[in-house]
Structure formats: C-alpha cells, structure tokens
Swiss-Prot record:
Residues 5-7 are annotated as: Ser-Xaa-Pro motif, crucial for potent interaction with nAChR. This is Alpha-conotoxin LsIA. Belongs to the conotoxin A superfamily. It holds the Pfam family Toxin_8. One of its GO terms (molecular function) is toxin activity. GO terms for cellular component: extracellular region; host cell postsynaptic membrane. Coiled coil: none annotated. It comes from the Eukaryota. Keywords: Acetylcholine receptor inhibiting toxin, Amidation, Disulfide bond, Neurotoxin, Postsynaptic neurotoxin, Secreted, Toxin. The cysteine framework is I (CC-C-C). Alpha4/7 pattern. The modification Cysteine amide is found at C17. Disulfide bonds join C3-C9, C4-C17. Alpha-conotoxins act on postsynaptic membranes, they bind to the nicotinic acetylcholine receptors (nAChR) and thus inhibit them. This globular toxin inhibits human alpha-7/CHRNA7 (IC(50)=0.3-10.1 nM), rat alpha-3-beta-2/CHRNA3-CHRNB2 (IC(50)=10.3 nM) and rat alpha-3-alpha-5-beta-2/CHRNA3-CHRNB5-CHRNB2 (IC(50)=31.2 nM).
Amino acid sequence: SGCCSNPACRVNNPNIC
C-alpha cells in the first residue's frame, strides 16, 4: 500500500521508492 505501490505516485516520487 502507499505511494510505492501506486504507479502514478511512484513515477513522481522515485526517491522514496
């Protein structure tokens, strides 16, 4: 769950994943 499992969020926040 969270940003890292959300593709749209993940591409905008690569540093936290």
